[in-house]
A protein has these predicted regions:
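Residue-identity detector for glycine
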Residues: 9-12, 23
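Short hydrophobic alpha-helical segments enriched in small aliphatic residues
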Residues: 16-18
Length: 251
């Protein structure tokens, strides 16, 4: 098929289904995306912007995954904002037989900026919440083996869960707090956020060197060791001292 035939075929498709590509006439209901909202302890509902996730930020978790903490710079990936949910029911994803839990401290930004100093990075923090980062561990292993990105393992419906956000004005800068996850009443993960290789302020400052951060951005700061599989029907409770618990059930 010649290039001209391809172009003519595309033009015909556009004319049939969209009338005019220049006018962006869309023959369907195309609504603006709805950003999920998180709830604060003082009753506000605020929209999520972007979701940044830090990997291998606890030494023992890095070891249990067969790796090590990168001491040169944090390693991060992103989830789509619409992959986030507040629960309490969380959908078990398709395309996996090995879904893993990862409890995390989440920092919520109230303002942003570029190339932030540590002082300015601290000032961007609006508050904190307990979060869960779910992983298709079998698909992640496949991606690692082939040298591919982790997106298939980390980005899907209900791939991230965020609890009620406690403003920093209520709790201060969080540097030391026990963090844990219970599954069906049994503690699976346990640690302290002071075990992070890079603390929350350092993570925000680093991310600001890569792109402009904005209000509503979330930073999942990594998980302690003890990650493992969960199945439909399991009841999970994420806990961090000083923050509201995050309960959920997989359906």
């Amino acid at each position: 098929m010649t290039a001209r035939k391809v172009v003519e075929g595309f033009d015909g498709l556009v004319n049939t289904h969209a009338q005019s590509i220049r006018g962006f006439e869309i023959p369907m209901n195309w609504n603006s995306p709805t950003h999920p909202e998180f709830l604060t302890t003082d009753g506000r509902r605020l929209p999520v912007n972007r979701v940044f996730c830090i990997a291998k930020n606890y030494e023992e978790h890095a070891k249990e995954m067969g790796g090590e903490v990168d001491r040169k710079a944090p390693f991060h990936f992103q989830k789509s904002f619409d992959a986030l949910t507040v629960g309490p029911e969380v959908r078990y994803p398709t395309q996996t037989d090995d879904l893993h839990h990862e409890v995390e401290l989440v920092a919520v930004l109230g303002q942003g900026g570029r190339h932030l100093s540590l002082k300015d990075a601290e000032a961007t923090i609006f508050g904190y919440a307990v979060g869960l980062d779910f992983t298709r561990r079998d698909r992640q292993a496949e991606a690692k083996e082939k040298g591919r990105p982790w997106e298939i393992a980390k980005n899907f419906d209900d791939a991230g869960v965020i609890g009620v956000v406690t403003p920093k004005t209520e709790i201060g800068l969080m540097e030391h707090a026990a963090i844990s996850l219970d599954v069906n009443g049994e503690t699976r993960q346990s640690g302290n956020i002071d075990q992070m290789a890079y603390n929350t302020v350092e993570l925000i400052a680093f991310l600001s060197t890569l792109q402009e951060l904005k209000a509503g951005d979330l930073v999942f700061t990594g998980t302690p060791s003890g990650v493992g599989s969960v199945i439909r029907g399991d009841h999970l409770v994420g806990k961090i001292d000083g923050l509201q618990d995050l309960p959920m059930t997989l359906i």
